[in-house]
């Protein structure tokens, strides 16, 4: 069952965590979420990692198998947009905010964290210094920073961070299912009650979806719920998406039977990926979002030519390939 709330300064429920454990595990550089711009930096193709399924890559394959290939196998670079980078900065600020003593988690302090967060992002990704172009007189940058502050204001309308003590922030979670598929993702925030109940929180810098699109929005959260269920043996009590632009929350309470079904869905997606990976037959799926795709010029649906298929990535060439084991 899902439910929505709007900006009402929601207080933490009685089962909110009271202890402070902050195992900030692995921030990494993988293209895992909307705020980690997918494939935005070139990857050393000489280094092969064991393929894993993340929420973003699973969604890519469902939407367009060729896009999955470009991002997960070819690891082609993409240039993030100002909107995407704004999301990165907002997430960085909220992560930093929860590192402060509870009494200091105030709107003014969050705004003070924006400029340092933006500076760190530029240091990690120097190419983003040209985000607004050489012709910018500073007004575009100022407007962009102001819009970042507005998203933070939206967050404070949804929640009082002084009442929440997360167990973890930017938490890397990973588990292997019985079928062999490796699931991996980053959770923005994990809250744990003294009773052991878990709440998964994800920040979105956009607006809440319409009700008929809720299932698509919750795909990512159910993914995290499956991983936590398999890692800890506990079904999260609540999955919460916080949409900062229009100050709405979408909450969902999963159950074990539903997560078991969703696990089978992930298995099916992975088997389809392996089947395509065997031959490199990742087909395009043209649609209304193609105009915003960074790879449109190399897509055969629009007269382009994809790069030569590099083959399925395996960490050890001496091992039997997962693709070889696929039906």
Give, region by region, the residue ranges found by the protein language model.
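C-terminal, charged and often intrinsically disordered regions of DNA end-processing helicases
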Residues: 1-84, 315-327
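Mg2+/Mn2+-dependent nuclease catalytic core
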Residues: 171-268
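Short cysteine clusters
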Residues: 64, 290-293, 299
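Short, polar/flexible loop-turn hinges at active-site or ligand-entry regions and domain interfaces
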Residues: 74-83, 100-105, 210-211, 280-281
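Polybasic (Lys/Arg-rich)
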Residues: 258-294
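Hydrophobic (often cysteine-bearing) scaffold residues that line and stabilize catalytic clefts
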Residues: 82, 86, 90, 144, ...
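A non-catalytic, helix-rich entry segment at domain boundaries
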Residues: 93-169
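Short cysteine/histidine-rich zinc-coordinating motifs and their immediately flanking basic loops
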Residues: 302-312
């Amino acid at each position: 069952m899902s439910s929505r709330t709007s900006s009402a300064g929601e207080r933490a429920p009685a089962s909110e965590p009271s202890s402070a454990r902050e195992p900030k595990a692995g921030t990494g550089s993988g293209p895992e979420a909307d705020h980690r711009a997918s494939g935005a930096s070139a990857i050393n193709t000489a280094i092969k990692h064991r393929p894993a399924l993340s929420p973003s890559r699973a969604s890519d394959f469902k939407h367009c198998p060729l896009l999955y290939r470009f991002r997960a196998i070819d690891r082609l670079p993409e240039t993030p947009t100002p909107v995407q980078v704004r999301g990165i900065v907002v997430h960085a600020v909220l992560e930093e905010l929860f590192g402060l003593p509870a009494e200091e988690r105030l709107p003014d302090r969050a705004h003070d964290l924006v400029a340092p967060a933006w500076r760190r992002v530029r240091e990690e990704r120097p190419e983003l210094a040209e985000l607004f172009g050489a012709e910018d007189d500073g007004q575009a940058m100022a407007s962009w920073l102001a819009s970042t502050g507005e998203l933070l204001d939206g967050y404070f309308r949804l929640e009082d961070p002084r009442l929440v003590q997360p167990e973890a922030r930017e938490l890397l979670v990973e588990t292997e299912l019985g079928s062999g598929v490796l699931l991996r993702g980053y959770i923005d925030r994990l809250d744990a009650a003294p009773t052991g109940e878990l709440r998964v929180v994800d920040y979105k810098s956009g607006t809440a979806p319409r009700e008929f699109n809720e299932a698509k929005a919750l795909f990512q959260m159910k993914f995290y719920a499956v991983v936590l269920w398999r890692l800890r043996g506990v079904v999260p009590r609540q999955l919460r998406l916080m949409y900062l632009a229009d100050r709405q929350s979408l909450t969902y309470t999963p159950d074990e039977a539903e997560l078991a079904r969703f696990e089978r869905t992930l298995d099916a997606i992975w088997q389809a990926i392996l089947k395509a990976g065997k031959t490199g037959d990742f087909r395009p799926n043209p649609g209304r979002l193609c105009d915003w795709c960074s790879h449109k010029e190399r897509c055969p649906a629009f007269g382009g030519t994809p790069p030569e298929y590099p083959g399925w990535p395996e960490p050890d060439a001496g091992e039997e390939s997962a693709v070889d084991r696929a039906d």
